[in-house]
Amino acid sequence: MVIMAMLSAVLMACGGNKTSATANGEQPLAGPDFNADSAWAFCLRQCQFGPRVMNSAAHDSCAQWIVSRFQQYGMTVSQQHATLKGYDGTSLNATNIIASFKPKATNRILICAHYDCRPWADNDADSANWQKPVMGANDGASGVAVMIELARLLSLNDSLDRGVDFVCFDAEDWGVPQWSDHQGDGSDTWALGAQ
């Protein structure tokens, strides 16, 4: 829901089409055409790497792909590397990816999603799947796909009068699984890359 609200704000602000006023004097909103097929392809490509579980080749390859897509669309990209500690003591090699449109602009829009996948399907109705990773198509990959599509649109029309920061958080999905006997509330084990 937050992504859709941000998407609407960006699309409305990106308008370059000439419009005429309505009967009450308000200008109709105009913006570039969001291409759902393009966003779908970006989501699919992430899933083709496999589950982007922390410390996996799929995770690292996907991160490199995300960086290259943002760079392809003219964004200024930086990465925040960190070694984080999971709830179970696992060292997690995390990389937040920040892609900026008009990085010198002082008025900015912030849009965020995460790209890592849950290593356990602990909410699956079938307990036989609890130890399997989640593909993360409708969670991490979809949000990142929308951000990449927005970056593509901004690369075609830079009339937006403010900057945009796209942040792809990492280590969001390593929270305590439901089947764990972990002591404590576990609330600080989620969204490690954003802490």
Regions from the language model: what does each represent?
Residues 10-13:
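C-terminal motif of bacterial Sec signal peptides marking the signal peptidase cleavage site
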Residues 15-18:
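Bacterial signal peptide processing site
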Residues 20-45:
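Post-signal peptide N-terminal segment of mature Sec-exported envelope proteins
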Residues 44-104:
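A non-catalytic alpha/beta surface segment that caps or lines the substrate-entry region
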Residues 46, 80-82, 101-103, 112-116, ...:
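Active-site-proximal beta-strand/loop segments in catalytic clefts of secreted hydrolases
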Residues 73-75, 105-109, 160-165:
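Loop/turn elements at helix/coil->beta-strand transitions in domains of secreted/extracellular proteins
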Residues 131-195:
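Acidic/histidine-rich catalytic neighborhood of metal-dependent amide-processing enzymes
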